[in-house]
C-alpha cells in the first residue's frame, strides 16, 4: 500500500515483519519506532502495529509496520495482513537453528499471499549473541543466493542495523514505485494525441499514489 498526502507525508508503505515466535520481531519494531528495547518482551498475540516516518531520497515516507505472530495457531489470522504489503522483513534467530530452517516455509507462505512486487529482506537477528551462533555465515549466504534475497544481521539490543534494514527496504520499495509511475507516464504520453494534455493516474494493488490536501 502506498498513499500520498501532501501535508503529512509523500508515501505510505505497508510492511510486515515475519518469522518464528521468539526471533525478536517485536523488539525490532519497538527499537525502530520508539528506540526502546525490553528484555522481557512477550510473544506477539495476533498482530501488533506501529508507524515511523523517515526520509527516502528527499521524499517523506511513512512506514506502516505490522508485527505478525510467529505461532502456528495464529497463521490463519495474520495471513490476512499480508494483503496490500509492499515490503517484508523476514527474521530468524542466529542462535536457534530451527528458526533458520523455517525461513523457506515463511517464504512459501509469503509468496502465496504477496503482491508480485513485494520487497523481501532476510535478517539474522540477535547478532549480539554471536558466541551462541547456531547458523553459519556460509549457510545464510547460500540461502540468500538461492532465494535471491537481500540480507543483513541485526541486533535490537544493540540497535545494530535496525534502521539500516528499514531504510534499505523502504528505499527499494520507493524505487519500484517510482519506476512504475514513470513507466505509466511514458505509456500514457506515447498514446496521447498530438496537442492534447494528458492526465496520469497510477493505481494498482501495491501502489496507490494520491494527491490532495486530505489527511488520513
Curated annotation (Swiss-Prot):
CDD domains referenced in this protein's UniProt entry, alphabetically: Rab11_like (cd01868)
InterPro entries registered for this protein in UniProt: P-loop_NTPase (IPR027417), Rab_GTPases_membrane_traffic (IPR050209), Small_GTP-bd (IPR005225), Small_GTPase (IPR001806)
Cell compartment(s), UniProt: Cell membrane
GO molecular function, one term: GTP binding
Motif Effector region: chain residues: 41-49
Classification via SUPFAM superfamilies: P-loop containing nucleoside triphosphate hydrolases
Lipid-substituted positions (S-geranylgeranyl cysteine): 213-214
Gene3D superfamilies (alphabetical): P-loop containing nucleotide triphosphate hydrolases
The name this protein goes by in its record: Ras-related protein Rab11A
Lineage: Eukaryota, Viridiplantae, Streptophyta, Embryophyta, Tracheophyta
Amino acid at each position: 500500500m502506498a498513499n500520498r498526502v501532501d501535508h503529512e507525508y509523500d508515501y505510505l508503505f505497508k510492511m510486515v515483519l515475519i518469522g518464528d515466535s521468539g526471533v525478536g520481531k517485536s523488539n525490532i519494531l519497538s527499537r525502530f519506532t520508539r528506540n526502546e528495547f525490553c528484555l522481557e518482551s512477550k510473544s506477539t498475540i495476533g498482530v501488533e502495529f506501529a508507524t515511523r516516518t523517515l526520509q527516502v531520497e528527499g521524499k517523506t515516507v511513512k512506514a506502516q509496520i505490522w508485527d505478525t505472530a510467529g505461532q502456528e495457531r495464529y497463521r490463519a489470522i495474520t495471513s490476512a495482513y499480508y494483503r496490500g504489503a509492499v515490503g517484508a522483513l523476514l527474521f530468524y534467530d542466529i542462535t536457534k537453528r530451527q528458526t533458520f530452517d523455517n525461513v523457506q516455509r515463511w517464504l512459501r507462505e509469503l509468496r502465496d499471499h504477496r503482491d508480485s512486487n513485494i520487497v523481501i529482506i532476510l535478517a539474522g537477528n540477535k547478532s549480539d549473541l554471536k558466541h551462541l551462533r547456531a547458523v553459519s555465515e556460509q549457510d545464510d549466504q547460500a540461502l540468500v543466493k538461492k532465494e535471491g534475497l537481500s540480507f543483513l544481521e541485526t541486533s535490537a539490543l544493540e540497535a545494530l542495523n535496525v534502521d539500516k534494514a528499514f531504510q534499505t527496504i523502504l528505499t527499494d520499495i520507493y524505487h519500484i514505485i517510482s519506476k512504475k509511475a514513470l513507466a505509466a507516464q511514458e505509456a500514457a504520453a506515447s498514446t496521447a494525441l498530438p496537442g492534447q494534455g494528458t492526465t496520469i493516474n497510477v493505481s494498482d494493488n501495491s501502489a496507490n499514489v494520491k494527491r490532495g490536501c486530505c489527511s488520513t
